[in-house]
A protein has these predicted regions:
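Short strand-turn motif at the edge of the Rossmann-like AdoMet-binding core
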Residues: 28-29, 54-57, 83
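Hydrophobic residues in well-ordered beta-strands that form the structural core
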Residues: 26, 51-53, 182
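Predominantly a Rossmann-like dinucleotide-binding segment in NAD(P)-dependent oxidoreductases
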Residues: 58-130
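Beta-loop-alpha module in the N-terminal Rossmann-like domain of NAD(P)-dependent dehydrogenases
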Residues: 1-42
């Protein structure tokens, strides 16, 4: 079952589907809090059902290639992510009409809508950060844009997400031997170039010509058909970790949802 409803309803419908014995693919973000994400993950495991969060980033061929070539950059020192996309609904929001994507009652906002891709990108490569800080532009209780900082033991990751403005997408992983540059948003995960400080540049684009959601749904189908619960469990762990970063970040910025305890 594929669940694509406003963010605040993801948990309700996912829980109901799992209780009914259905495998579930739920749109990102899986849940508005880490506790609720953990609840869904444990429910799926207890019933031996597949539960996947539909976040395209981590299933793209280029993302797998980034993980493969990452050691070439040397010791990672900085990571930059920018997913800024002016929303067609922002004008309505400014005029007082609120769509779910800009409604705190629906668990909306730039972080939950776009930032989730950046966080998934970073956490999927490096695991959970040690510290999180979110400086957001907030209007009527919701973030229309913001800058998220994730601190790791030996490097910092910065994520910009915006629905009130646009900019070119940039994903850069900087290291002591070179850097990886990607000029597309994390949901597409387009071509990547490795720029070594010594030697020739290397470019790869393994996802060219494929629909954006093709890789993830092929992965879901293969996992279910082959009963690959190990993959499902591993991806659920990542989804819970991403949910924890998102929750910590928005709480840090003073953004509250109805599901918060």
């Amino acid at each position: 079952m594929y669940i694509a409803v406003p963010n605040i309803l993801h948990v309700k419908y996912t829980r109901a589907a799992l209780e009914a014995g259905r495998h579930v693919i739920v749109e990102k973000p899986m849940a508005p809090t880490a506790a609720l994400a953990e609840e869904l993950a444990e429910l799926a495991r207890s019933k031996k059902l597949f539960l996947f969060e539909a976040v395209t980033t981590q299933y793209q061929d280029n993302y797998a290639k980034i993980r493969e070539v990452l050691p070439k950059v040397g010791a990672v020192t900085m990571v930059q992510c920018n997913f800024s996309q002016y929303s067609s609904r922002y004008h309505d929001f400014c005029a007082g009409k609120v769509w779910p994507s800009f409604d705190p009652a629906c668990a909306g906002g730039a972080l939950m809508d776009l930032g989730v891709y950046n966080v998934s990108y970073v956490v999927g490569l490096f695991g959970s950060p040690n510290k999180v800080h979110y400086a957001a532009n907030i209007t009527r209780g919701i973030d229309t844009s913001g800058v998220l900082t994730m601190e790791y033991r030996s490097f910092k990751a910065v994520s910009i997400n915006a629905k009130d403005s646009s900019s070119p997408a940039r994903y850069i992983i900087q290291g002591t031997k070179g850097y990886l540059l990607q000029k597309s948003t994390a949901n597409f995960c387009g071509g990547v170039t490795f720029h070594p400080y010594k030697g020739k540049e290397e470019h790869f684009n393994l996802s060219a010509g494929r629909p954006r959601q093709a890789a993830e749904f092929h992965a879901f189908a293969r996992a279910i058909e082959s009963e690959d619960m190990e993959l499902c469990s591993r991806m659920l762990d990542t989804s819970v970790a991403v949910s924890r970063v998102l929750e910590t970040a928005r709480r840090d910025a003073g953004i509250r949802f109805a599901t918060d305890l």
